């Protein structure tokens, strides 16, 4: 006969095995967690905004990791088995806050050391510029400059690596947009939640297990153009939708924005080239449209302590048919000799 204590313990184990994110849920629910990574039963890593650290969580064995990965894939409406050994998906209603989580999993033998799980927490980005400045994510010398970029309706892209804080900065800047402007945001996954009274959000949808029902970001950018936007925003530019976004920004929709993966501002033109090619835009046309459509790049990165911060502001210049990023402010060096280029842009918009 089992006593009450043993019965309750067994029920807790069963609940952990069958609901939510299992033993990973406390990590996912913790304040500040952005990523939880499983590389082996005894190797669970967490990023809480200060870089990756190894957690104390341990799975019983490889089978336990595999079961969790397959259950999460099923909850996301995806398939994960030997015939389909990797999966991308999105989970909703995780944790007390009911937040969303982006799921990626790979099964062995493709993952040679065992099932790998990568979970990205998609908490709504709600902080404003003042909060980021107070937290040290934006240098006081740059905070006013960032606000001026928004007020002047300059089109901008936030660039940076994975988990650098691109969406957080973008949301904060959108929160500084005048309340009488209408913002239409297009996202692959719902992350942007700026504090703005007139915000419309469109979120893409993956095809179901039968391969139907997909709604792409590119399709939604085209829909956004029909919704009388003052500003069009693409949460993450990573495909052929760059063609439609640049076209929108070149047809009277000033102050548009988005994020793009790049290690530094200088890499953004080449990154946009590659994305434009996916949409059938050749190199010359891409550079021509990019020069006319986007004025400013804001680069975010982690400092040596792993903290996210605004690291660099650059303007785009076109020379001999090619767009180049020119740094006007750097977190370690302050304003550059080219800062006048940004001030000229701001003055021209103020007098328009």
Swiss-Prot record:
GO cellular component terms, A-Z: cytoplasm
InterPro entries reported in the protein's UniProt record: P-loop_NTPase (IPR027417), T2SS/T4SS_dom (IPR001482), T4SS_GSP_E_ATPase (IPR050921), TadA-like_ATPase (IPR022399)
Disruption phenotype: Not essential for growth.
Main location: cytoplasm
Binding positions for ATP per the UniProt entry: 160-167
Superkingdom per UniProt: Bacteria
Keywords of this entry: ATP-binding, Conjugation, Cytoplasm, Nucleotide-binding, Transport
Pfam families with a match to the protein in the record: T2SSE (PF00437)
Record's note on what induces expression: Expressed at a higher level in a phoP disruption mutant than in the wild type.
GO molecular function: ATP binding; ATP hydrolysis activity
Record's subcellular location: Cytoplasm
NCBIfam families: heli_sec_ATPase
Family in the record: Belongs to the GSP E family.
Protein name, UniProt field: Putative conjugal transfer protein Rv3659c
Species of the source: Mycobacterium tuberculosis (strain ATCC 25618 / H37Rv)
